């Protein structure tokens, strides 16, 4: 498991690193440390992080800022808030945190948080394995100002966010609604949809052409003529799906 600890206090990072390494819940975890959000973002760009221990009251920053950004990742890590203050607990769990632990850290409490994370990951794996794909029956309803549109999921070419609005496109048309990309992703639970940029999810079966792009990335040309650049942090997963 890859774990990131974000805390502006070096001693707190060292203490939590030690307790995680001592825990019997994990076998040789890889632990990364960051003292601010910028450093954490760089690690998230380079590594697939499974779990973040996230302090809330950072010097001149707030841990919720990073927590809100994680939804844009292809595979968001689980979050355990690790802070000295208990009054953030409600907001933390509203942010879908896996757990919330208080300083000073205790081995037993860290073990409990890690066990909870493992259980969440296990249940998620079971759910994905048990899901039988029914491409012809999957539908997406888009509520417009004057009517609702029902689309078959396999007919969708892409979904992208721009200026806070979600555009869902098909071969012949597109629809723009006030939804988030995460809203679409939770409804596109099939292996032919893949996030290729923080703003874009595409239907892999609707890719018509792949072109080289800037900084050793790619540009996807879809069957309807739309073109989408692939973000650098999404290249590895795209290559795996397309066996490039």
Curated annotation (Swiss-Prot):
Modified residues (4-aspartylphosphate): 55
Annotated InterPro entries: CheY-like_superfamily (IPR011006), LytR-like (IPR046947), LytTR_DNA-bd_dom (IPR007492), Sig_transdc_resp-reg_receiver (IPR001789)
Domain Response regulatory: 2-118
Domain of life: Bacteria
Residue ranges annotated for the HTH LytTR-type domain, each copy included: 140-244
Alphabetical UniProt keywords: Cytoplasm, DNA-binding, Phosphoprotein, Transcription, Transcription regulation, Two-component regulatory system
Matching SUPFAM superfamilies: CheY-like
The record's account of how the chain is modified after translation: Phosphorylated by LytS.
SMART domains: LytTR (SM00850), REC (SM00448)
Function: Member of the two-component regulatory system LytR/LytS that probably regulates genes involved in cell wall metabolism.
Protein name: Sensory transduction protein LytR
């Amino acid at each position: 498991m890859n774990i990131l600890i974000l805390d502006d206090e070096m001693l707190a990072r060292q203490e939590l690193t030690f307790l995680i390494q001592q825990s019997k819940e994990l076998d040789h975890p890889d632990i990364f440390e960051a003292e601010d959000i910028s450093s954490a973002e760089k690690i998230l760009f380079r590594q697939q992080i499974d779990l973040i221990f996230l302090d809330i009251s950072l010097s001149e920053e707030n841990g919720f800022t990073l927590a809100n950004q994680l939804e844009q990742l292809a595979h968001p890590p689980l979050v355990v808030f690790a802070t000295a203050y208990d009054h953030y607990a409600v907001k933390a769990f509203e942010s879908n945190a896996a757990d919330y632990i208080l300083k000073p850290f205790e081995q037993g409490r860290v073990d409990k948080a890690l066990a909870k994370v493992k259980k969440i990951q296990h249940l998620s794996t079971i759910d994905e394995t048990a899901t039988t794909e029914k491409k012809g029956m999957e539908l997406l309803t888009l509520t417009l100002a004057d009517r609702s549109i029902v689309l078959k999921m396999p007919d969708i070419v892409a979904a992208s966010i721009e200026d806070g609005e979600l555009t869902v496109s098909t071969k012949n048309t597109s629809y723009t609604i006030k939804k988030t990309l995460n809203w679409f992703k939770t409804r596109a639970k099939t292996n032919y949809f893949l996030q290729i940029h923080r703003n874009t999810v595409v239907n892999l079966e609707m890719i018509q052409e792949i072109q080289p792009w800037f900084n050793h990335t790619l540009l996807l040309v879809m069957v309807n003529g739309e073109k989408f650049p692939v973000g650098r942090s999404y290249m590895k997963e795209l290559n795996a799906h397309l066996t490039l």
